[in-house]
Amino acid sequence: MLDAPEQDPVDPGDPASPPHGEAEQPLPGPRWPRALRASATRRALLLTALGGLLIAGLVTAIPAVGRAPERLAGYIASNPVPSTGAKINASFNRVASGDCLMWPDGTPESAAIVSCADEHRFEVAESIDMRTFPGMEYGQNAAPPSPARIQQISEEQCEAAVRRYLGTKFDPNSKFTISMLWPGDRAWRQAGERRMLCGLQSPGPNNQQLAFKGKVADIDQSKVWPAGTCLGIDATTNQPIDVPVDCAAPHAMEVSGTVNLAERFPDALPSEPEQDGFIKDACTRMTDAYLAPLKLRTTTLTLIYPTLTLPSWSAGSRVVACSIGATLGNGGWATLVNSAKGALLINGQPPVPPPDIPEERLNLPPIPLQLPTPRPAPPAQQLPSTPPGTQHLPAQQPVVTPTRPPESHAPASAAPAETQPPPPDAGAPPATQSPEATPPGPAEPAPAG
């Protein structure tokens, strides 16, 4: 956290100036009891465009999974935004796209332009002068934007600026987060400052930025951390936050290793099944080695790993992290405290390991499987359908004898139709006529004698 002066400035002509004869120097350590007033020294505000928290006067950009406007509003309400001084760091106005900034821990107002080959905390993608925007929102007499509006401006301006800056090297799942740096309320009011810097940073523990070397487009942007790193959790949404924290603090995941896909796939992006098989095997081995002599099943945690998308692969990312954690049934994540290799707590309770599987059950001898001897199908299954000569005869049922050969049925069933004796009446129709045929009419009278 940035430091505030213990005494208010006494120079009425310049509220941002320190008392006469004293140098403006930050005090060591967080001291804000009396600093939440408009007379605080110059500060810079850093905002994460993709995740999270508007920070006033300190560098605590936390890239969360998804946006968290509720946390933003709650944080500002509980810790009002300190005003910044009217005097602006000279580097702030001289910086250009591609420049890199470095500052001591917690003092972004002391940012200086350095070579990107050296350690730095911020890479500038674009310097945006909001005075060029239409309307009166950024006019000379306009009030400073609210924290929620600053969040919105950052999302609208900085994400597009970073995409333009990196081009095909933009990795949407990069370990670097899109951020905004601006001078703050007092510079807005007293100096008419309307400039903001959109760029990239690497969030680190204790709400600080990790220093890195080289330009983002030229280095591996893979979102990985050393084994043993714990990643935070958003207490409001129960979602992971890709920021390292102390494992003794609440967190969502613990990193157990990293896998380099280029070792197996040096050329084109492998398919999802190919990635999954390779990463799963490698992560399983690494996690077993990381937890030894413990076993993953005794922690009741789950092995977690991502795969790479085409945009990430095109940007040059090749490495993924293996982690362990626990998900909830509602889509959230369990809150872990302490390392999985120690006194782990899951949602405040120690894990209850499942019963051990006896060794003899893990190595059961193979059981010989005796297949039944195939039997010939019974003759009844080979019977043909009822012959056409009988199946349509009215009031006559086909004769089916399963135990007889099928060829003996055809003549037997067809014989009655040809050899049936005629009825007693000599004038009846032939035997081939249907029994239900129309009866003969009355006999003609004998001719007269």
Swiss-Prot record:
It comes from the Bacteria. Residues 365-387, 437-449 have a biased composition (Pro residues). Residues 1-11 have a biased composition (Acidic residues). Residues 409-418 have a biased composition (Low complexity). The chain crosses the membrane at residues 45-65. Its main location: membrane. GO terms for cellular component: extracellular region; peptidoglycan-based cell wall; plasma membrane. Pfam families: Septum_form. InterPro entries: Septum_form. Keywords: Cell membrane, Membrane, Secreted, Transmembrane, Transmembrane helix. It is a single-pass membrane protein. Residues 1-33, 349-449 are annotated as: Disordered. Induction: Down-regulated upon starvation. Induced by albendazole and thiabendazole, which inhibit the GTPase activity of FtsZ and probably septum formation. Coiled coil: none annotated. This is Uncharacterized membrane protein Rv3835.
